[in-house]
From Swiss-Prot:
PANTHER family with a match to the protein in the record: 12-OXOPHYTODIENOATE REDUCTASE-LIKE PROTEIN 1-RELATED, NADH OXIDOREDUCTASE-RELATED
Positions with a binding annotation for substrate: 160-163, 252
Active site: 165 (proton donor)
Binding positions (FMN): 14-16, 47, 89, 212, 282, 303-304
Protein name: Putative 12-oxophytodienoate reductase-like protein 1
CDD domains assigned to the protein according to its UniProt record, in alphabetical order: OYE_like_FMN (cd02933)
Residue segments, region Disordered: 99-128
Annotated positions of the N-acetylmethionine modification: 1
Entry's family note: Belongs to the NADH:flavin oxidoreductase/NADH oxidase family.
Domain of life: Eukaryota
EC class name: oxidoreductase
Amino acid sequence: MKNFNLTHRIVMAPMARMRSYGNIPQPHVALYYCQRTTPGGLLISEATGVSETAMAYQNMPGIWRKEQIEAWKPIVDAVHSHGGIFFCQLWHAGRVSHQDCQPNGESPVSSTDKPFADDPSNEFTPPRRLRTDEIPTIINDFRLAARNATEAGFDGVEIHGAHGYLIDQFMKDSVNDRTDSYGGSLENRCRFALQVIEAVSKEIGPDRVGIRLSPFADYMESGDTDPKRLGLYMAKSLNRFEILYCHMIEPRMKTVSEIFECRESLTPMRNAFNGTFIVAGGYTREDGNKAVAEGRTDLVAYGRLFLANPDLPKRFELNAPLNK
Ligand SMILES: Cc1cc2nc3c(=O)[nH]c(=O)nc-3n(C[C@H](O)[C@H](O)[C@H](O)COP(=O)(O)O)c2cc1C
């Protein structure tokens, strides 16, 4: 990976913990990340909110306030002291939120005002469609959050463009029903994502920027009628900005946890993108090795296996038994 001296290809996938009380990461999280750090290993943080309106769920961390930046510093330092490379995943939940998580109890914002079709326990508040003139403010929130992440010491940021959150709500045609320059054609639907990438890259340098995408997933009612075209368009467009990496979720992961039989592959996107490619979703030691050996990816991110096995790289090296 350009400018980073990785010693192996096993990446810790971003995983929300929901233990950041008051949206401030707590000191105990340093231990959690350090347990999963190896010298020259890449870790991606839990989803971290870029602003007050970005938030959802309980106790997710943020990185828009001074207090949050200060709280991240010793955590990032701890990972660095173990030789790790640490990227902060920048997140805006969009409509996957509830008014109780929003400033002044307002509706969450989205590309649309469509509520979830299937939300029996009213987990989510119907969203308010962002006006075209409000969109630059959200892009600016990502830019400032990236600056804050570098101030906190992170080596770079991963823009969360996956899993039905705000950026995905713009990209996917089942969600985005806009009629302005951010809706309709594929080019228009991807405009927001690409403007975020551009702003963040200009702020901290493209060599410190990655993005996570899940064109094939329909998690949080975020399916697309032509995911291959979407994934390919994004992979090609990213080259304009020369960002560090593109992290894609395997088509077999329709949600974040269920694995489906699937014939689709990420190879066209991998071939279209010029930077480092990372895959994630249901990988084992064996098929991770196979994906690398066959040239289908550069790096493989592991989620649940890393959660249950903090020393995952060592266990893979020894081919040792794994905790479930
Ligand atoms: C507890 C948990 C929290 C997660 N939180 C995030 C997150 O904050 N951001 C994200 O992009 N993906 C998140 N994911 C998805 C994982 O990064 C990963 O893509 C998924 O678990 C599939 O990979 P795996 O089969 O190796 O676990 C989460 C998954 C789990 C299990």
